[in-house]
Amino acid sequence: MNIDTVHIGALQAFGYTEEEARFLYVVATHSGYFVARQFLAFAGVQWGKRTTLFWNKLQSNKHARTCSMPRHRAVYHLVARKLYRQLGRENLRNCRRHELEYIRTRLAILDFVLANATVSYLETEADKVGFFCRDLNIEARHLPSKTYLGRRTVQPTLRYFVDRFPMFLENPQAAVRIVTFSFIQGSEASLSAFAHHLQTYSSLFRELREFRFLYLSRIDAHFAKARELFHALVTVPLESNPADDLLRYFAIRKAWDLHQYGSLTEADLEFRNVSKERFAGERFEHFYRAWKADRLPESHIRATFHGHHVPHVTHFEARILKPFAASGEAEGEGQ
């Protein structure tokens, strides 16, 4: 992780040491929140005068406020707009108050970034848009986006990659740069948020010849299901052309219509839910009715929807996300 010396200097101007400035840069860029164990492990120090001075600087500069979470001593929230402005991060929504689950996710993101400091992160929205649109020549319409209605202007604002999960290149100097996406599973038992995330990124995934995806969680309870879901929503669609997808959807839909539920897997049902929107409309309804009645051969569908098959290579990994802490520091904290 290479941090521009300009950013370090901007933070040192507030009275922070170089190490404190580096830590605050990472927090401001990736999370907005941190807990003591993360700073202690980053700085390689224990509780004492050094840490007390750091906390005092944060308070005297009014750069952070503390909030409490179950089983945490305290959570520090970087809230000073002037600090973000100095780093060119004023568009981040880190200054606002957030719900408990959001804070947990931001702390988990920081754990990952601190533990994987050697990769090259696409840190900001501009970095990500520039990489995909300028470097890879992908149109912006394929990027995951969200429209915000401003409180001070009637013009809506279109923002990209609002989830801000870590995205990085392991070797930015390689001839072919392969990007790694990630998703951090929250405390919820459902994988609906993960499915929604994959669907949001599906258009971008289709534009990439190769990419990696990390599914991160504190526990491994959902690993098998997450892998199955990724295979159904990402791997299979990218490995097949539109005709294959359409015929698979027709077969699943026919089984559902005939109440043959036992023949369908969870992956089939997820694929059906995604494909209903993709293959919606009168044309596809006409094709389905004709195919179901054996009036339309598969060869005709393949000739109609032959597409231009581009090979895609996807790499999926489910990984335990451990707290970033010195030995023993994470014990007793809610993660």
Task: List where the protein language model places each region.
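Non-membrane alpha-helical secondary structure
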Residues: 3, 50, 97, 101-104, ...
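Exposed, interaction-prone assembly regions rather than primary DNA-binding/catalytic cores
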Residues: 99-193
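C-terminal regulatory/effector modules of DNA-binding transcriptional regulators
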Residues: 170-335
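A short, terminal or domain-edge coil/loop segment
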Residues: 31-33, 120-132, 265-283
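Basic, Lys/Arg-rich alpha-helical nucleic-acid-recognition elements, primarily the DNA-binding modules
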Residues: 1-85
